[in-house]
Amino acid sequence: MNESIFPHWNSDQAITFLKEWNFSLGVILLLITIILQFGYTSRSMFVYLIKMIILWLMWPLTIILTIFNCFYALNNIFLGLSILFTIISIVIWILYFVNSIRLFIRTGSWWSFNPETNNLMCIDMKGKMYVRPVIEDYHTLTATVIRGHLYIQGVKLGTGYTLADLPVYVTVAKVQVLCTYKRAFLDKLDVNSGFAVFVKSKVGNYRLPSSKSSGMDTALLRA
């Protein structure tokens, strides 16, 4: 490979490079750390989307670096490790796409390609399906309505709703199954505010309906 494109650096040149770019690299790493640490859907959807882009780029960048290491390995041991890491990275990257496509088929939501989690919370509010990622496999989900603003697990979904608009069932879609949560408790705090608790009641191989249906038996369709 042409050394003019990939020049060989000695230790002094590397130290000089770090001295010149140390401040910029520090700022970039600080921003990335803050975004990864505080990027949650319950805080800022914009910051969370940036976080998802950063996480999404990590695997292809890793694959590029491992392939690069295969061409510039220090010895045969490093070459073998670089090839192994390249294979592992590519396999995991392919599995990510396979699982994301399967989840997309189940939900029809682009949140299926979220690199952080394969759990998607789905709630039908007056015929409009909201889909948002949830990090953990919760046994209960909490829906809160505050002066018409709807929140699920602290994540704001929309406005103009009342407690009466809350459905009887909420689902969490996974790659393998669809978990159904049934409303077990509802408490009205005032005219426009209150909350409801949904408890996991059913797990099966289902997909979300493409349109609103009446009744739970028709709302869950076999995949």
UniProtKB/Swiss-Prot annotation:
Keywords: Glycoprotein, Host Golgi apparatus, Host membrane, Host-virus interaction, Membrane, Transmembrane, Transmembrane helix, Viral envelope protein, Viral immunoevasion, Viral matrix protein, Virion. This is Membrane protein. One of its GO terms (cellular component) is membrane. Its main location: virion. InterPro entries: M_CoV, M_HCoV-like. Residues 42-51, 102-223 are intravirion. The chain crosses the membrane at residues 21-41, 52-72, 81-101. It is a multi-pass membrane protein. Component of the viral envelope that plays a central role in virus morphogenesis and assembly via its interactions with other viral proteins. The keyword Transmembrane helix applies. One of its GO terms (molecular function) is structural constituent of virion. It holds the Pfam family CoV_M. Belongs to the betacoronaviruses M protein family. Homomultimer. Interacts with envelope E protein in the budding compartment of the host cell, which is located between endoplasmic reticulum and the Golgi complex. Forms a complex with HE and S proteins. Interacts with nucleocapsid N protein. This interaction probably participates in RNA packaging into the virus. The gene is M. It comes from the Viruses. Residues 1-20, 73-80 are virion surface. Isolate N2 belongs to genotype B. It is found in: Virion membrane; Host Golgi apparatus membrane.
